[in-house]
Design a protein with these regions (language model features):
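Catalytic-domain carbohydrate-binding cleft regions of carbohydrate-active enzymes
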Residues: 1-176
């Protein structure tokens, strides 16, 4: 994530950024988020979610319980869950289990919410968050270099487009 992304997001109407990579081992960051500052001085609230962005079917409640156990000192938290790749969607099974856990949990207030509400709540705490004025790179440099067949086909397609453009120009000059 280049620092230039901040300016693009801010000038596109975003005020916050939720991400999962790079991981803590690669890029240590404050656990409660930070203000990410772009090259031009643009600022957005940023937060790296913990525990990935999904949960296997029937494991969302366990994910919440684990987070609560591992973060007793935190007053505000964000736990993403859903079945499927890249977050997926909520399952009825998980919703029922989470609702049952909410009903019996006396130690914490747990609500179904949105990232936007999380960032609004963070802002409302008026906690001064650290500022980061640099990239969040580098994450998995060259991770797509092993996709040689895809790259070869893409290059072939690019060259075909150049040929079609030349043929169209020649046809136009010939009045065709």
């Amino acid at each position: 994530h280049t620092q230039g992304l901040v300016q693009i997001l801010k000038k596109s109407g975003y005020d916050s950024y939720l991400f999962g990579r790079p991981h803590e081992e690669v890029c240590p960051l404050p656990p409660d988020g930070f203000i990410w500052v772009g090259y031009d001085g643009s600022e957005i609230a940023a937060h790296r979610f913990i525990g990935w962005y999904n949960a296997p079917l029937g494991k969302a409640r366990e994910k919440i319980e684990t987070w609560l156990k591992d973060n007793p000192e935190r007053e505000l938290g964000l736990i993403l869950w859903g079945v499927g790749n890249h977050g997926g969607g909520p399952s009825r099974k998980d919703v029922r289990e989470i609702d049952a856990f909410i009903a019996q949990c006396n130690d914490a207030e747990i609500i179904h919410s949105t990232p936007e509400a999380y960032f609004a709540e963070m802002a409302a705490t008026n906690t001064k968050r650290p500022r980061r004025e640099q990239d969040l790179n580098s994450w998995a440099p060259g991770c797509y270099t092993s996709q040689i067949r895809l790259k070869q086909q893409h290059r072939l397609l690019e060259n075909m487009l150049f040929m079609v453009e030349k043929m169209a120009a020649a046809a136009t000059l010939q009045g065709l």
